[in-house]
Every structure is written in structure tokens, then in C-alpha cells.
């Protein structure tokens, strides 16, 4: 930085570290990497930067906040011996998109049907059965990204805060129950042997199912919103509508982190659109 203008980046290539300068810097490191790099550069919540021993270039409290994602849980089932489990075959070819009961947000839920399921954290080619994946497409809750170290090679701390909000738990809970109802259909009678998870004990009440949700909820890898754009009136808006970092010159963020909220779909196409739009402005 020279004053409040970004003038370049420090780059590591192999064992070599060098600087690259430009009239305008485009930061495009994703929903985790972009806020991390900004904070390591002194742009972020001042208290957190001081806590990490980083000189404050710009107090921007929204950097790393507003972490949005699509929380999901998996409902795996055992299959009968004659059902083919092929790890090489296409797995997810069918999805149900729907609006949760009582929701004012259209298409806020999704259920994916998969013809092959492997254990969480295990060998992806080891078949345990088939599964439904229940996805909350528009969560109310939001998390944060914070630095764990001043070393850029150390992954920052991710606090997703999944299902902190009762409405998020309610919708995902009912989504799981819809998965179980689908499994009662006649077409599954010759396929399904029984549930792997949740267990009958997990299904006793809303509270027991909520505990199962909290143990099993995971990311759909659509982390968004951690450098969100917004109007002047929003103190948590990191960027303006043209993706410029507010309070600085010569620096934009262009990736999924600019979204104010996670879209109700996979994020890849939208991220490409954002990049194409900014490229038009720069040309």
C-alpha cells in the first residue's frame, strides 16, 4: 500500500518471494482465501488484527464475517444384496427442489438422490448403500472466518455456526423426515434393507433429531459472503457495487465472497458471471 492505495502483491513461487505491482489489484481467492489475505494485509476488523499483531491498514469490520453456505446432512440406507453399488457410475442424477412449509423463500430446500453412498470421512469408493442428501439452500444463520496465524499457509479458523437459528433447524429437520417418507414409496421396497442413519433413537422427537442434525451437518462447499458488497449505509459491507474495497483505492475483490447471501444453487456459474461483469467494467 501507498497511503490508502493498493499498489501490488507479494507472491511466493517455490522458494522465491517477489513483488508484482499494478495500477489495480484484483483479489480472487474465494470465500476463505480472500478475507484471509485481506486480514493478513491489515484490512479487516481492527480488534482482530491487533489481536494477531497485524498493523491496521483499514478497519473493515465485515471482512471474514457473514460466512454463508448450504448446510447439508446425509441420510444413508443399506441396500439389498442384489442392488449394484458401482463407485464408477454416475451417483446423483435426480434432485428435488422445494419450498419448506411456512417459508416465504421460494426453493429454499433441496434433496439429492444418490445411487452410491460411502462413509463420511472414509474411502469414497467403499460402498455402504445409497443415500439422500438434504440441503438447506437459504440458511438464516451465518458464520465467520478468522485468522488462526499470520502465516498465509495456515488455514484460517472457520466457524460455520450451522443450525444456530431455530428456523434453519426446523427446515432441515423436516427435510430429513421427507427423505424418510420418500423411502417408504413402493419403488424402494425391492432396494432398501434399512436405515443406516438417523437411527430410531434419533427419530424419537424433534430434540433428538436436532441433536443428530448438529452431529452430522456439514458443508456443501459453497462458502460465500465473507467480503460482501452492499450500500454505504451498511457498516458491514466490505465492497461497493463495483467490487471495490470500501475505503481503499486500486483494490477489488472478485469471487464468491462478494455475495451478500449464498444463492439457492451451486455457486460456480454465478462466480463466473461476477468475474465477467467486472471484466467488462475494466475493459
Model-inferred region functions:
Residues 2-87, 149-150:
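Glycine-rich loop(s) and the adjacent beta-strand/alpha-helix scaffold that form part
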Residues 7-8, 80-84, 91, 95-270, ...:
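FAD-dependent oxidoreductase catalytic-site/capping-region signature
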Amino acid at each position: 500500500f501507498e497511503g490508502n492505495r493498493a499498489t501490488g502483491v507479494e507472491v511466493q513461487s517455490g522458494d522465491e518471494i517477489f513483488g508484482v505491482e499494478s495500477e489495480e489489484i484484483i483479489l480472487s481467492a474465494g470465500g476463505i482465501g480472500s478475507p484471509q489475505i485481506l486480514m493478513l494485509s491489515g484490512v479487516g476488523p481492527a480488534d482482530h488484527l491487533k489481536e494477531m499483531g497485524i498493523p491496521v491498514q483499514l478497519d473493515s469490520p465485515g471482512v471474514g464475517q457473514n460466512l454463508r453456505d448450504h448446510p447439508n446432512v446425509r441420510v444413508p440406507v443399506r441396500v439389498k444384496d442384489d442392488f449394484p453399488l458401482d463407485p464408477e457410475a454416475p451417483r446423483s442424477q435426480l434432485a428435488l427442489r422445494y419450498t419448506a412449509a411456512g417459508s416465504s423463500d421460494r426453493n429454499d430446500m433441496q434433496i439429492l438422490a444418490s445411487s452410491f453412498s460411502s462413509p463420511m470421512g472414509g474411502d469414497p469408493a467403499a460402498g455402504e448403500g445409497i443415500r439422500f442428501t438434504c440441503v438447506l439452500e437459504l440458511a438464516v444463520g451465518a458464520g465467520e472466518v478468522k485468522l488462526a496465524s499470520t502465516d498465509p499457509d495456515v488455514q484460517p479458523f472457520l466457524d460455520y455456526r450451522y443450525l444456530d437459528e431455530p428456523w434453519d433447524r426446523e427446515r432441515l429437520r423436516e427435510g430429513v423426515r421427507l427423505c424418510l417418507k420418500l423411502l417408504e414409496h413402493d419403488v424402494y421396497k425391492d432396494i432398501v434393507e434399512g436405515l443406516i442413519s438417523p437411527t430410531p433413537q434419533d427419530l424419537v422427537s424433534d430434540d433428538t433429531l436436532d441433536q443428530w442434525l448438529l452431529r452430522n451437518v456439514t458443508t456443501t462447499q459453497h462458502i460465500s459472503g465473507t467480503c460482501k458488497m452492499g450500500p454505504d449505509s451498511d457498516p458491514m459491507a466490505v465492497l461497493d457495487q463495483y467490487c471495490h474495497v470500501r475505503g481503499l483505492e486500486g483494490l477489488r475483490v472478485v469471487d464468491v465472497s462478494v455475495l451478500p447471501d449464498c444463492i439457492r444453487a451451486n455457486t460456480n456459474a454465478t462466480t463466473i458471471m461476477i468475474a465477467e461483469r467486472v471484466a467488462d467494467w475494466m475493459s
